[in-house]
Curated annotation (Swiss-Prot):
Family of this protein: In the N-terminal section; belongs to the enoyl-CoA hydratase/isomerase family. In the C-terminal section; belongs to the 3-hydroxyacyl-CoA dehydrogenase family.
Protein name in the entry: Fatty acid oxidation complex subunit alpha
Residues annotated as site: Important for catalytic activity: E119, E139
Alphabetical GO biological process terms: fatty acid beta-oxidation
GO molecular function, one term: delta(3)-delta(2)-enoyl-CoA isomerase activity
Residues that bind NAD(+): M325, D344, V401, V402, E403, K408, S430, N454
TM annotation in the entry: none
Metabolic or biological pathway: Lipid metabolism; fatty acid beta-oxidation
Positions contributing to substrate binding: D296, N501, Y661
């Protein structure tokens, strides 16, 4: 043994060829601070080892290295710039030490080599993998950029254009893609990887392969003429700015770093990369996006724990109520390996549900994400039926019939009498209280809400609603089933609107009050989209949701929370509903809709809307961007905080993920609680107080007043780390 540490070891294989194996005791290998320090010492040991002729990097896991340890990021990023720069300089020196070994080096991969894992293999002279190999640099998705030499080495290995595409998109290349661009030198059968690696390094050591030429290319300036460089970088900056937009600086910063470093040798180029990395790491966007990643891991951890705690796994399921929603739920269940019965009283609805599942599978087939054989298997695992025969075999039943409490209660009561005592019943409802539906059941402990969002196959969030009598076993089983379906389940306690709809309607309330006071809805949409970062402004969102749906839900919320969500007189939602302007579904709402060449709805402004709004709005008045944002967002933020205060949702992490996954809250802001931390709770309280005369929706919750007085924040705990 040449060197051994907790997460890696080095030994000689044969004829002076050594193997450095990453072998962390955890389930995956990560380049955390401890592993980097061990790698540095291992390379010193290799440099001192007599008779060394070559080095092969390997991993004892199914994935090579999944990247740096992101749990350390926020703590590191909170350090002063000089300390962060010093940490990066140390990391860079390690990979340069690997690259400068006086012998040929090769990375032998299976599975993922991502982020720091990719940057590690870029420091070696050769790279081979099996067909499971996936190599990429996802850092820009976290609001940062490669900082271990990825922006320096990747362009020199595969060319600037291909490198910028991978880096700016946070893309991972499959083995065949990596081979095509030159990121992999060969794809080898898994059982022949080691033999192939030894042969390649032996050939290089015997000067049959020019490893030194490869190394020189990586450590020199990019071989681009001035004209080529100008065309390449100008085009890349234009495309990236258009795609990423102004709220996500990481992609464009990475292009600028590659451009600035293009004419420098490796060490000078690494200095340039490091400067830009530090700038991004200190940004609020990076803090928010890294925080979201950590929150997502937290949600996955809760789901994993629920699965382990449940006494029974879901092997079969049933969906009651077909159509688009039922078909989407059945598709998602079958796609992830849980056979499902889809029951409806109408043949036409069953056909609609099966057509929805078939359409979604055909899309995957056309994109090469599954083959015809697998598609047929998935489709055959959905059993459409007009009868209940076979429903007793289901472990979990999802009721997805029409949004009517009497109909839902009747269906749930009926099916409860046909299934075993340990079968779990759920209701896919967006507005009907779970405690109300539970009254129709003999075993309410086996019942909870399971609120899917439309379209089911795209929306990652599922709200799991705990009723007054719901058992922990029921929650665990349904959370585990939702996770098995590939969804992000978040448990909330029962209340009108649950969590997502409860916090959405104060947002619509703030919007309606702005309209009442004379604001232009098209300007509000532009400000909320372009300045705050929502995918669509409130008027456009109401059109997509449907003004009829919003009108009904608004009445439910007003009944549940009359002080904050009740209103005097009619508002814009009422006016459009009465005028039968329901939005996209019937071609006219706040905007008018037509179908474009691709068959997608295209919105335009029509003055036909103005007389309808005139009845519920005052004389036109101009509001500045900041006022618009504050008046629309304060009611939502307050309601989110009240949900935490009341225990409707358990943690800031779960709330922020629900907002991003369920409503499209701008990811670069990280969710309401991350946003409050970034602006400062004290600052928010002072700002919100200036609007309190607008009504109860604008009253600051006691929790925020208390935290502001103590100088607290919601995410203090995520900063813990040390250099």
């Amino acid at each position: 043994m040449i060197y051994q540490a907790n997460t890696l070891q080095v030994k000689e294989l044969q004829d002076g060829i050594a193997e450095l194996s990453f072998c962390a005791p955890a389930s995956v290998n990560k380049l955390d601070l401890a592993t980097l320090e061990s790698l540095d010492k291992a390379l010193d040991a290799l440099n001192a080892h007599a008779g060394l002729r070559g080095l092969i990097l390997t991993s004892n896991k199914d994935a090579f290295i999944v990247g740096a340890d992101i749990t350390e990021f926020l703590g590191l990023f909170a350090k002063p710039e000089a300390e962060l720069d010093e940490w990066l300089r140390f990391a860079n020196s390690i990979f340069s030490k690997l690259e400068d070994l006086p012998v040929p080096t090769l990375s032998m991969m299976r599975g993922h080599a991502l982020g720091g894992g990719c940057e590690c293999v870029l420091a070696t002279d050769f790279r081979i993998g099996d067909k499971t190999t996936s190599i990429g640099l996802p850092e820009t998705k976290l609001g940062i950029m490669p900082g271990f030499g990825g922006c320096v080495r990747l362009p020199r290995v595969i060319g600037a254009d291909s490198a910028m595409e991978i880096i700016t998109q946070g893309k991972a290349c499959r083995a065949d893609e990596a081979l095509k661009v030159g990121l992999l030198d060969a794809i080898v059968e898994t059982d022949q990887l080691l033999e192939s690696a030894i042969n390649t390094v032996s050939l290089a050591a015997n000067e049959k392969l020019d490893w030194q030429l490869r190394r020189k290319q990586k450590t020199s300036a990019l071989s681009l003429s001035k004209l080529e460089a100008m065309m390449s970088f100008t085009m890349a900056k234009g495309l990236v700015a258009q795609k990423a937009g102004p709220h996500y600086p990481a992609p464009i910063t990475s292009v600028i770093a590659i451009e600035e470093a293009a004419r420098s040798d490796r060490d000078a180029a690494l200095d340039i990369e490091r400067k830009h990395f530090v700038k991004l790491a200190k940004s609020e966007e990076a803090k928010a996006l890294v925080g979201l990643f950590l929150n997502d891991q937290y949600i996955k951890g809760l789901a994993k724990h629920a699965g382990k705690s449940a006494n029974k796994a879901t092997e079969r399921a049933a969906v009651l109520g077909a159509g688009i929603m039922g078909g989407g739920i059945a598709y998602q269940s079958a796609l992830k390996g849980v056979p499902v019965m889809m029951k409806d009283i109408a043949q036409a609805s069953l056909e609609l549900g099966m057509n929805e599942a078939s359409k979604l599978l055909n899309k995957r087939l056309s994109r090469g994400r599954l083959d015809g054989f697998k598609m047929a298997g998935i489709l055959s695992s959905i059993t459409p039926s007009l009868h209940y025969a076979g429903v007793e075999q289901s472990d979990v039943i999802v009721e997805a019939v029409v949004e009517n409490p009497k109909v839902k209660a009747a269906v749930l009561s009926e099916v409860e009498g046909l299934v075993g005592e340990d079968t779990v019943l759920t209701s896919n409802t967006s507005t009907i209280p779970i405690n109300l539906l539970a009254k129709s059941l003999k075993r309410p402990e086996n019942f909870c809400g399971m609120h899917f969002f439309n379209p089911v196959h795209r929306m990652p969030l599922v709200e799991i609603i705990r009723g007054e009598h719901t058992s922990e076993e029921t929650i665990n089983r349904v959370v585990a089933y939702a996770a098995k379906m590939g969804k992000s389940p978040i448990v909330v306690n029962d209340c009108p609107g649950f969590f997502v709809n409860r916090v959405l309607f104060p947002y619509f309330g703030g919007f309606s009050m702005l309209l009442r006071d004379g604001a232009d809805f098209t300007k509000i949409d532009k400000v909320m989209e372009r300045k705050f970062g929502w995918p669509m402004g409130p008027a456009y969102l109401l059109d997509v949701v449907g003004l009829d749906t919003a009108h009904h839900a608004q009445a439910v919320m007003a009944q549940g929370f009359p002080e904050r969500m009740g209103k005097e007189g009619r508002d814009a939602i009422d006016a459009l509903y009465v005028a039968e302007k329901y939005g996209q579904k019937n071609g006219s709402g706040f905007y008018t809709y037509s179908v474009d060449k691709r068959g997608r709805p295209k919105k335009t402004f029509s003055e036909d809307i103005l007389p309808i709004l005139a009845d519920v709005c005052q004389q036109p008045q101009d509001f500045d961007d900041q006022t618009i944002i504050q008046r629309v967002m304060i009611p939502m933020i307050n309601e989110v905080v009240l949900c935490l205060e009341e225990g409707i949702i358990a943690t800031p992490q779960e709330a922020d993920m629900a907002l991003v996954y369920g409503l499209g809250f701008p990811p670069f802001r990280g969710g309401v609680f991350r946003y409050l931390d970034s602006v400062g709770i004290g600052n928010f309280v002072e700002m919100a107080k200036s609007y309190q005369d607008l009504g109860a929706m604008y009253q600051v919750p006691q929790l925020l007043l208390d935290m502001a007085a103590k100088g607290e924040s919601f995410y203090d705990g995520q900063q813990a780390s040390s250099l």
